[in-house]
Structure formats: structure tokens, C-alpha cells
Regions:
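Compositionally biased, intrinsically disordered or flexible polar/acidic segments
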Residues: 1-175
Length: 175
């Protein structure tokens, strides 16, 4: 059987939507503002980047210190090999509400009407499967409203041709 990772273990991708300087170490969170997607970089805004802005959240830190926001739908792409992943999205602000917003992953709606009150923060994990060479994460809000996201982390869980336990519940038994 042939694995579909580019490396022995696919690295964790950490993105913080901020204007901080580039990280000194590769495992640190990569700051991203409104950079468009390029295949050389392997990440960036695929659609809607012209309307993406950064706003402070009233707290310090790489994850929750600032966030990307937009009033028009936008799509963020990360190049990855096909496989199963945990996508953790971070939301919140000390000074303003978050959402309500809708999240699509590879065109599939994964979260609708999500929102937080000012002063609330949340890390939201999603199980995602990529059958291609990228994951596209879409952000949108109702007309006249804005979407927001602070950071994201993409962690590899397994390749598509690994053990079936990643896709089938182990507790299912035939009678």
C-alpha cells in the first residue's frame, strides 16, 4: 500500500490571522493578513481577500489577539495531501460579538449560525477529509453582517488508505 503523505508525518499547519512578524521557528503559528493564495506558499485567501481586514480583539496572544473579518464571503485555502484531518477554528473577542457566521469546508456546510457574545472565546474542532490536494475553508455571514476568525490549526490524522477505524464507528456490531 502506498501512503499519500509528502513527509514521514504531515506537519501541523498553524495560521493566526494577524499582522505579527513571521515566526522564527517553523512550528510556530504563521501570521496571515489578506495575502492571496499562491501555490508556492501553499496557503492564502483564494476568494474574497480584497474585503478581508484585521481587527484587534482586546486581548494579547498569537491565537486570540486579532482576527480576520469581512462582510463578503471569502475562502481560505491550505495545500495538503489527501487524508483525514482535524481542523480547529478559533473565534472570539473581548470587545465585540462574533458572527453569526457560516463555515463551509470544501463546499460542504459544516457550521451555520455560529456566534459568540463579546468576551467569549471558543476553539471549534471539525473532522474534515480531503480527497484532493487542498482544503478550502469558506467564511460567510448574513447580508449586512460580518464573519470573523482568529486562527486555525490543521492536524493530520491519517491517510485515505489507512485503517478503516478513522471512518467507521468501532462500536457498530452486526447482530
Amino acid at each position: 500500500q502506498q501512503a499519500n503523505y509528502r513527509y514521514g508525518f504531515e506537519p501541523v499547519r498553524k495560521i493566526a490571522f494577524s499582522s505579527a512578524p513571521p515566526p522564527r521557528k517553523p512550528q510556530e503559528r504563521q501570521p496571515v493578513a489578506a495575502e492571496p493564495y499562491t501555490s508556492e506558499r501553499g496557503w492564502g485567501w483564494l476568494e474574497g481577500q480584497a474585503a478581508v481586514t484585521l481587527e484587534a480583539t482586546g486581548v494579547e496572544g498569537a491565537v486570540y489577539g486579532s482576527r480576520a473579518t469581512g462582510s463578503a464571503p471569502a475562502v481560505f485555502r491550505i495545500d495538503i495531501p489527501a487524508g483525514h484531518y482535524y481542523l480547529t477554528l478559533n473565534f472570539g473577542s473581548a470587545t465585540a460579538a462574533t458572527g453569526p457566521l457560516t463555515i463551509h469546508v470544501n463546499g460542504e456546510e459544516r457550521l451555520a449560525g455560529f456566534g459568540l457574545e463579546p468576551g467569549r472565546f471558543r476553539a471549534l474542532p471539525l473532522w474534515v477529509t480531503s480527497r484532493g490536494d487542498a482544503i478550502d475553508i469558506g467564511f460567510s455571514a448574513a447580508a449586512g453582517a460580518s464573519w470573523q476568525v482568529n486562527a486555525l490549526t490543521l492536524s493530520a490524522m491519517g491517510t485515505l488508505n489507512e485503517d478503516y477505524t478513522l471512518t467507521r464507528p468501532w462500536w457498530r456490531f452486526e447482530h
